[in-house]
């Protein structure tokens, strides 16, 4: 299969791939973008991989379509990153110490395949508002949200896992629908955590999860088995108007 490769290349000036169609497999390896990088409304027809790549200023992937599998491995985003309304039709992997040093926006982003954030650092605020996760979704391997993390109004259709994940800033999980199992395992919420008005349709677990400040589960709906086994609440959680199909496990 034909491919387009940018290896060991440095873009000193702003790069604009907006509205461009990459017709084949696309590789960016050990590539450096010293100024703004624009991939707005771009289409990657095949697999797209970004390995050991650095984006020094702002980066735009808004309204971008990734039709194949996509990898961001050991990538550094030093400036603000915009993935708003992007569509990932294949698997999306953000792995191996990929770092968002500034704010990262995934508002209204659509993940149609399985999604993995493994050993990723979000140093600024991160937004996944109204994002759609159609496949299985996993945040794991010490993925850390240092700023405010917002998932309000997102929809998770497959199995969702937050394993060994740390939220240092406020964590907002309001008005979310988890259609499949939702598992928060050995996850730490160092600041306020809000799950208000969220619908949990599948098996839900917060096992060995630590809530170090206030946590609220106001008006949530748990429609299957719900477990807080071995969870640690440093303050009394707020379950006002919460509804469980059966008593949750503590």
Residue ranges of model-derived segments:
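N-terminal leader/targeting and pre-domain segments
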Residues: 1-250
């Amino acid at each position: 299969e034909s491919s387009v490769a940018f290896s060991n290349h440095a873009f000193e000036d702003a790069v604009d791939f907006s509205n461009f169609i990459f017709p084949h497999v696309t590789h960016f390896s050990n590539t450096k973008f010293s100024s703004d990088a624009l991939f707005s409304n771009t289409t990657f027809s095949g697999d797209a991989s970004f390995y050991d790549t650095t984006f020094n200023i702002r980066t735009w992937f808004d309204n971008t379509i990734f039709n194949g599998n996509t990898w961001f491995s050991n990538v550094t985003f030093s400036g603000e990153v915009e993935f708003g309304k992007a569509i990932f039709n294949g698997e999306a992997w953000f792995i191996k110490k990929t770092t968002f040093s500034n704010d990262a926006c995934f508002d209204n982003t659509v993940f149609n395949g399985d999604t993995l954030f493994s050993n990723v650092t979000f140093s600024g605020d991160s937004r996944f508002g109204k994002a759609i996760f159609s496949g299985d979704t996993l945040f794991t391997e010490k993925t850390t949200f240092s700023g405010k993390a917002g998932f309000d109004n997102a929809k998770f259709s497959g199995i969702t896992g937050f394993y060994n994940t740390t939220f240092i800033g406020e964590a907002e999980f309001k008005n979310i629908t988890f259609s499949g199992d939702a598992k928060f395992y050995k996850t730490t919420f160092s600041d306020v955590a809000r799950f208000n008005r969220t619908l949990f349709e599948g098996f839900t677990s917060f096992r060995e999860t630590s809530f170090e400040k206030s946590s609220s589960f106001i008006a949530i709906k748990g429609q299957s088995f719900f477990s807080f086994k071995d969870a640690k609440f440093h303050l009394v959680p707020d379950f006002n108007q919460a509804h469980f199909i059966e008593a949750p496990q503590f």
